[in-house]
């Protein structure tokens, strides 16, 4: 039986809505309060400049959930002296001498994010690796770099790194040109891990303007899976989806407990990456064999058609035996296995990122029936499509 309430808790949520990351966190917070509230919520949509607490005369608050991005919010939260949960606090806020170090926190597991990115490129048989960071003072970015570089190094490979110079007089255009020059010098093909999606878009733009082919020469993977940013990139950006909605839910749950028991201060909860959402920026498996690259591109653009090995051999104008041998030598799989892999990836993407009925997905992926697609899907992943959607959907 829940604790009897005598009044509705007043909670301020300071999260900018310009990022998919923070919107997903907000969804999780609202989900918790809908189940366990009600709360009286104070929230202002907008960017970081719009995030501020109302005056104490206007608002008698009981709790705060916040992502602090400027000093004004920092000072207002400190002076509020009410139960607060910090989400992904900056490095300066978690050093033992800072008052925020004693606050409850929900943090992303940046080491696991970096490891996931490295494994992703290694499984695609890359031999060249690079990392592009965001602000050098952001600990989460450095942690992602350390983990990514560490896994790559353990496999005997070198990782090239680029970190922007945020100094006095910094200019975005100058940084873009410097980034483009750096990308040109990288050994190709190369798998590039961007600390966040915004950086991933900048890499793609620099490649486009410099005539660097994506993904044939440079494959790019971001973090956050901000769908608007990723889908409007050229080409669309692959990204690591984080469990942000669950993080928001846990932040709200932690605040609820904290408002009832202030002795919980200092509790830290971490949330993990969920999965990699594959888009065109990483769709080509690296190979020095131009025939293989062209074949993979043909398979990709026909992922919604019931294309078979004979169709591919005819299009490439080469004997099946020769193409199969070069495929096996270059990629370690058969042509049919690659066709099936690409189709499964498309099914997974449509299941996770849309609410389309399964029979519509079957049509879009070149299957004659939903039932046959379901059999193929279960053979590869060991679960039904409904089970997969329930577990991985970005829309839930």
Descriptions of predicted regions:
Residues 1-65, 71-320, 324-325, 329, ...:
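Bacterial carbohydrate/catabolite-sensing allosteric modules
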Residues 373:
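Binding-interface segments
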């Amino acid at each position: 039986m829940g604790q009897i309430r005598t009044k509705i808790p007043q909670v301020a949520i300071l999260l900018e809505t310009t990022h998919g990351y923070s919107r997903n966190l907000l969804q999780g917070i609202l989900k918790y309060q809908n189940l366990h509230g009600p709360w009286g919520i104070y929230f202002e949509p907008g960017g970081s400049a719009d995030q501020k607490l109302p005056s104490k005369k206007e608002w008698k608050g009981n709790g705060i959930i916040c992502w602090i991005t400027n000093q004004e919010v920092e000072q207002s939260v400190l002076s509020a002296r009410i139960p607060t949960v910090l989400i992904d606090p900056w490095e300066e806020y978690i050093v033992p001498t800072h008052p925020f170090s004693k606050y409850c926190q929900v943090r992303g597991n940046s080491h696991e994010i970096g490891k996931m990115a490295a494994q992703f490129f290694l499984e695609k048989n890359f031999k060249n690796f690079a990392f592009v960071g965001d602000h050098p003072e952001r600990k989460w970015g450095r942690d992602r770099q350390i983990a990514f570089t560490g896994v790559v190094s353990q496999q005997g490979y070198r990782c090239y790194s680029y970190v922007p110079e945020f100094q006095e007089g910094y200019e975005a255009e100058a940084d873009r040109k410097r980034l483009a020059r750096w990308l040109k010098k990288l050994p190709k093909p190369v798998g590039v891990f961007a600390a966040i999606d915004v950086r991933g878009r900048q890499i793609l733009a620099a490649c486009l303007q410099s005539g660097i082919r994506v993904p044939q020469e440079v494959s790019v993977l971001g973090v956050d899976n901000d769908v608007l940013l990723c889908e409007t990139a050229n080409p669309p950006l692959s990204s690591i989806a984080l469990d942000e909605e669950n993080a928001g839910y846990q932040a709200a749950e932690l605040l609820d407990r904290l408002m009832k028991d202030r002795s919980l201060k200092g509790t830290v909860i971490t949330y993990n990456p969920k999965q990699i959402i594959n888009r065109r920026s990483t769709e080509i498996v690296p190979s020095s064999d131009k025939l293989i690259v062209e074949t993979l591109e043909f398979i990709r653009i026909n992922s919604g058609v019931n294309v078979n090995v004979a169709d591919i051999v005819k299009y490439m104008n080469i004997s099946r035996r020769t193409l199969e041998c070069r495929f096996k030598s270059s990629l370690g799989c058969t042509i049919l296995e690659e066709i099936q892999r690409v189709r499964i990836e498309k099914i997974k993407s449509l299941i996770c990122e849309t609410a389309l009925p399964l029979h519509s997905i079957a049509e879009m992926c070149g299957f004659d029936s939903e039932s046959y697609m379901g059999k193929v899907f279960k053979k590869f992943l060991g679960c039904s499509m409904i089970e997969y959607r329930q577990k991985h959907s970005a829309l839930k």
